[in-house]
Amino acid sequence: MPTPRPRSTPRWDEAAHTPGLYDTTRRADYGKRFLYTVIRLSLAAFAGLCVYASYEPNGLWLAAPLGIALLIIALQPWGDKSPAPGAWLGALIAFTQGLITYLFYLPWIGEYVGSLPWIALSIVEALYSLAFGAGTVFLLRAGRAARKREPRVSPARSQKGCSNAARDSSTSKKGSSSEDRLSGRGRVRVHRTITANEFLFTVIGIPTWYLAVEFARSHWPFGGFAWTRLAWGQVSGPLLSLARIGGPALITVATVTMGVGIAIIFRRIWIPGLVITLVIPIVAGLAWSQVDAGPNPSTERIDSFAKSNDVASSNNGADNGAEAHESGPQAQSIQMMSKESGITYYRASDSSSPENLVTVAVVQGNVPRLGLDFNDQQRAVLANHRDATLALARRIENHKSPKPDFVVWPENSSDVDPFLDPLARDEIQQAAEAAGVPILVGTLTHPGDQERNTVVVWDPETGPGERHDKVYLQPFGEYMPWRGFFRHFSSYVDMAGNFSPGDDNGVVHVRSGKTNALIPVGVGTCYEVAFDGAFQHAVEGGAQIFTVPTNNATFGFTDMSYQQLAMSRLRSVEYDRATVVAATSGVSAIIRPDGRVSERTQIFTEGILHAQLPLRSTRTIASYSATIIEWTLCGLGVVVALGAAISQRKPQRVKSK
């Protein structure tokens, strides 16, 4: 007869007949559960901080897989001391992780409208994590179900195993590839590997289920909020190359899969965990050999300092250059001081063949004041960009700067409709004629009774031409859904715009100011860069270079501009296109097709960027199949999660007559 397992707690009938014993045991049980719940929630909060650390400007890409791993560990059973949490607790754990991430990631929302919108949006975004947490609990249970079925052992082996408990225990601590456990039935050898169930429900199920939840968050309601996608935190790591295959969706799945691998390592299943964790970044890193960044630029920076700041400005200019200038080993940096204006010039030139290259100039005119009220000085903003362009024209005339093919102004660089205001029209025309090349102007237009956020091509000879009306509008900013309802919570709803979306593919054709050739430019205005459809439609429409005109002045010195820049970098890699970011107050940037930033400005400064960039008509795998890959992975995640939940339904008891 096998030796019965000693009971650590009294039987229910013993507790029932012992005064106070049952209550004491129950209170101890509740205390232990509460303690482990607090530990799990604390671990989830730290996981949220790790995920936040992966986003720009922090750029700690490896922190995201670590954060996902900590979240999965918080949802796992911790031996006999703390069994796996239920679905409700799992949902709360994931909600905690999401809330901490978004509270740290989105404070720019409330920069000038108060903390209520920031906190409310963070809570709404974290609500989607409830589904991920509950689903992951079911997936983990289904994955570990096979491990609960232990093999039978003979009584003789059982007694032998019990009599040699100390020896077996010491043997199991020597790092072998298997684990010897003692149970009431004897010694059981548990191999350090993962079962087919675990591979399906954990390695495949958890990453794809995460993507499915992220997909819902990015599309619903009001068009979704794609700003919080996990992939945006991977632009500084090797996983970025996966964008050319499956876009942000594949990067998200790869990131979560690495987190699953780290969680498996935590369970001391070494080899499978290491393989899952390392194979993805290694393969992605090797894929960079297939990524063509285009010609290597040699860079020149020329700083022009304000008249009233001779010494102080020159010191600041040197510091600014150190931060703004990013170049490869072949780059050279040349600094010159001039007192002709307060504009900082950055130029990236190329000495290779001019074939399929285009020269672009970006004007960052800055805004007269920080905050929402800068729109009250609409003409001052327009004047800033006109004056900066006139300064550029003088440099071109004096052969200090190369003549560009076209110039890009930011979103809202003219908050006055030039089609209705003759003075605004004259100022833009003056700038275009002085530069002698077309300008992409971000402005407001009013077709019919609508108001639209527009980027229009302004030719020095023919005036306004093709235009892109912003398709993906920012809810609660550019338009206000349910305005009457939300007015009960904040009076700031009346500050939201009333824009109407456009319906074009985002491609405008710009006549080169040097060759007269038409250049197809894909435009993604500000918020649009976060959405897959914006540049996807532009590439399908023949865009050979991207531009992202944006207005971030409302968000001050927060991380918003750097977060948006990360999205532009990922889009460059995804579609193999150079991207020009033009911001009213920064950060403006030149992005190579490999996602590398060759030049950028600082926030709330005046500056001009020059760059010679490649035009490309080839298409990546992602441009054909990213949508199909995303839908397939999302569908797989939903099916596997539902299968895990259904497989654990408790059988109904049949009442005996």
Give the location of each predicted region:
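Cytoplasmic C-terminal tails of single-pass
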Residues: 653-657
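Active-site catalytic loop in hydrolytic enzyme cores
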Residues: 109-116, 143, 182, 218-246, ...
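Short hydrophobic alpha-helical segments used for membrane anchoring or interfacial signaling
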Residues: 205, 442, 458, 591-592
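Short, conserved active-site loops that position catalytic residues or coordinate cofactors/metal ions
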Residues: 57-72, 101-104, 364-365, 401-416, ...
